[in-house]
């Protein structure tokens, strides 16, 4: 769902930082 996509994006952002 939308929340899952947002969570996935948040995880990617965390990995980039």
From Swiss-Prot:
InterPro entries with a match to the protein in the record: Antimicrobial_8
Record PTM Valine amide, positions in chain: 17
GO BP field: defense response
Major subcellular site: secreted
GO cellular component, one term: extracellular region
Expression sites by tissue: Expressed by the skin dorsal glands.
Cell compartment(s), UniProt: Secreted
Domain of life: Eukaryota
Alphabetic keyword roster: Amidation, Amphibian defense peptide, Secreted
UniProt-recorded name of the protein: Uperin-3.2
Organism from which the protein derives: Uperoleia inundata (Floodplain toadlet)
